[in-house]
Amino acid sequence: MRAYREPMDRPEVTLANYDAVYDFYRDHQQPRAIARLAYAMLAARYRPRVNYRAGARDAVREMIATGTPVVIVANHLTHSDQYTLAATAWRSPLRTLIGRTRVLAKDELFREPRQRREVDMMGGIPVFRAKNHGVRAVADAGRRMMDVAALRLSRGDALAIFPEGTCNTGDPAQVQAVGSGIGHIVRRAAALGVQPALVTVGIAYGPDNDPGRPASVFITLPVPELAGSPREVTQRVAEELQCAVDGAVARY
């Protein structure tokens, strides 16, 4: 993927610098034309086979056309999943959201300059994970991240999340525990006056979990409004994600 030039005032992505980091990503906008080109290239390279629950393709298209903010969730199996998801976006009605989708991504992806440019171009927002920095250390940064994610939804952006938080090294057909962060983001977005919809994407790379082969991808019927407490939202997301994974595995 060809890199593009970002503004020179990008803050260093470190936990100690999280306030400046989230001030930057609160308003950061990638060039949409370049993002579309990159997603098209990823679609040509990764070639996911995209299938849908009956009626889901039209339902997703119609929902996006209403301008409803969308939360896109996918299961996490390998370090190639973000590229598979980007390729899926290009090959589905999600294409219209390219260039205005924020993607929550672990902070390690923002360290190397070239990789950071690519992640920024794809709409990345850094996440400082407790498994890397400790629960107490990331608490304040986590709250800022959720505030920024909710604000972007309230402005009409979509938000893409791998809510399991880490690669599934166990049974790829079984969704891991879903973190409560997605529930808190949705609750914060509701406080800002928007009720996001949910689009769920299941990914399967076959029995060997080999990302070198085209993935089976399955998109379920969208949930028009994510509502309830953070815990209730998180539970609904987990249920929808397992249904999507079941569909992807069955169609591999």
Range-by-range predicted roles:
Residues L104, I125, A197-V201:
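Hydrophobic/aromatic beta-strand patches that form the interior of the parallel beta-sheet core
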Residues R2-V13, N17-V21, Y25-R26, R136-Y252:
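Non-catalytic C-terminal accessory region of glycerolipid acyltransferases
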Residues T101-D107:
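Short internal beta-strands
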